[in-house]
């Protein structure tokens, strides 16, 4: 059984290709010519000319280009609706190249080699009631067609506002890990290569999942330590706690930035203290913490804020942190500024005025990256040049409440 409906958006809204209905042709012919034609209008006129010439008028579903570092995935949970939606965006052209439906509070994943994107999700027999089914679905990134549909036994998913690192892929993209909260904390293991559920690994009261290798991941525990978990080929897992790296009153945000490829975990607190951990050696190496804001700025109310508040770019070793002046309890409110920080020295490189209320930030992992600033209120993705701080393009009409932005860790 397939749990998602897939589709590719066509020409009028986003300028992809095929149109071809007689009514549309008549409408275009009757309309007044614009001084500067949009791509969609030009495509529609070409389709009308083809129709008049007697060419075939059958609809054609196009394939998207293969994923590159600038393919952006935006997830809209639709304010806790039973059916949610994904938007796939070409960052170079600022166009939606496809959409896919999800279930209730899906957790999106994107393969680091661009071979698929997918979700761990939940649906109900009668849309929002009835028998619950949890599943993992993988989709072809060019057609959006399902390539794997794996049902999870006993409805194990933790249904909470979409936290990207509650579900994760191992570096080889062959295993998906997801978090279970009840009846006891555990991490589910899904064999993507074999297209089957594997097992649950019981863990102590720890959260988030950061794979450091194909058989090892780390979690954050309530006492301020990390838990190292070895999956174990024999079905037996091994666990070991690290040192405690933050104090009880140093509250970490819910959405850290993590690069499985480099093993760098970047985790700010509510006040802008940034902890960095190197997980690349299979052990946790705690780097010196840095401060995003000066003491004077903190007194003025400057602090991180948003849903996904931080992003990390591997090659430049830079941190991008959303921030604004806010009350202490407003750490989930959007921000109007982005702070660019050298991850090695802690030095502030730039302060970008975004001129929009931004909830989530992402960055492409190419040599000259793009910054992606997602506004839930505007239902729009704004694309920036991180060097100049200038907005270069935008994509609007992204659902009801888009909240999560993801790129491939290529």
UniProtKB/Swiss-Prot annotation:
Keyword Signal annotated: yes
Signal peptide: 1-35
The protein's Enzyme Commission number: 1.4.9.1
A GO CC term assigned to this protein in UniProt: periplasmic space
Molecular function GO labels: aliphatic amine dehydrogenase activity; methylamine dehydrogenase (amicyanin) activity
Domain of life assignment: Bacteria
BP terms from Gene Ontology: methylamine metabolic process
Alphabetic keyword roster: Electron transport, Oxidoreductase, Periplasm, Signal, Transport
InterPro entries: MeN_DH_Hvc, Metamine_DH_Hvc, Quino_amine_DH_bsu, WD40/YVTN_repeat-like_dom_sf
Compartments where found: Periplasm
Stored Gene3D superfamilies: YVTN repeat-like/Quinoprotein amine dehydrogenase
Pfam families per record: Me-amine-dh_H (PF06433)
SUPFAM superfamilies (alphabetical): YVTN repeat-like/Quinoprotein amine dehydrogenase
Major location category of this protein: periplasm
Reaction catalysed by this enzyme: 2 oxidized [amicyanin] + methylamine + H2O = 2 reduced [amicyanin] + formaldehyde + NH4(+) + 2 H(+)
Subunit structure: Tetramer of two light and two heavy chains.
Function of the protein: Methylamine dehydrogenase carries out the oxidation of methylamine. Electrons are passed from methylamine dehydrogenase to amicyanin.
Protein family per UniProt: Belongs to the aromatic amine dehydrogenase heavy chain family.
Protein name: Methylamine dehydrogenase heavy chain
Gene source species: Methylorubrum extorquens (strain ATCC 14718 / DSM 1338 / JCM 2805 / NCIMB 9133 / AM1)
């Amino acid at each position: 059984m397939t749990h998602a409906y897939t589709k590719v958006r066509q020409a009028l809204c986003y300028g992809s290709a095929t149109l071809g209905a007689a009514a549309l042709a008549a409408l275009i012919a009757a309309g007044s010519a614009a001084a500067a034609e949009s791509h969609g209008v030009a495509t529609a006129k070409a389709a009308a000319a083809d129709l008049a010439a007697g060419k075939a008028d059958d609809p054609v579903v196009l394939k998207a280009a293969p994923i590159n570092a600038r393919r952006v995935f935006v997830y809209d949970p639709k304010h806790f609706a039973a059916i949610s939606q994904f938007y796939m965006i070409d960052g170079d052209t600022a166009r939606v190249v496809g959409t896919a439906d999800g279930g209730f509070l899906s957790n999106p994943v994107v393969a680091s080699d661009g071979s698929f994107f997918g979700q761990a999700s939940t649906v109900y027999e009668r849309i929002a009631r009835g028998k619950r089914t949890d599943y993992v679905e993988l989709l072809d990134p060019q057609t959006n067609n399902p390539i794997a549909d794996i049902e999870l036994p006993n409805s194990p998913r933790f249904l909470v506002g979409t936290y990207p690192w509650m579900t994760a892929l191992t570096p080889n993209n062959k295993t998906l890990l997801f978090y279970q909260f009840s009846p006891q904390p555990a991490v589910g293991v899904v064999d993507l290569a074999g297209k089957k559920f594997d097992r649950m690994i019981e863990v102590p009261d720890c959260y988030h999942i950061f794979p450091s290798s194909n058989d090892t991941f780390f979690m954050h525990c309530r006492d301020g330590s990390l838990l190292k978990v070895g999956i174990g080929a024999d079905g037996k897992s091994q666990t070991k706690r690290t040192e405690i790296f933050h104090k009880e009153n140093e509250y970490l945000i819910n959405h850290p930035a993590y690069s499985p490829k480099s093993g760098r975990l970047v985790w700010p607190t509510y006040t802008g203290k940034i902890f960095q951990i190197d997980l690349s050696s299979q052990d946790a190496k705690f780097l010196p913490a840095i401060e995003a804001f000066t003491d004077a700025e903190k007194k003025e109310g400057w602090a991180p804020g948003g849903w996904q508040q931080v992003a990390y770019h591997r090659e430049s070793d830079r941190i991008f942190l959303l921030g604004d002046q806010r009350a202490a309890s407003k750490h989930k409110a959007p921000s109007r500024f982005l702070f660019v920080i050298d991850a090695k020295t802690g030095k502030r490189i730039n302060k970008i005025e975004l001129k929009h209320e931004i909830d989530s930030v992402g960055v492409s992992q190419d040599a000259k990256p793009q910054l992606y600033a997602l506004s839930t209120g505007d239902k729009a993705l704004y694309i920036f040049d991180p060097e100049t701080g200038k907005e270069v393009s935008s994509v609007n009409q992204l659902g009801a409440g888009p909240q999560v932005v993801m790129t491939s860790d290529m």
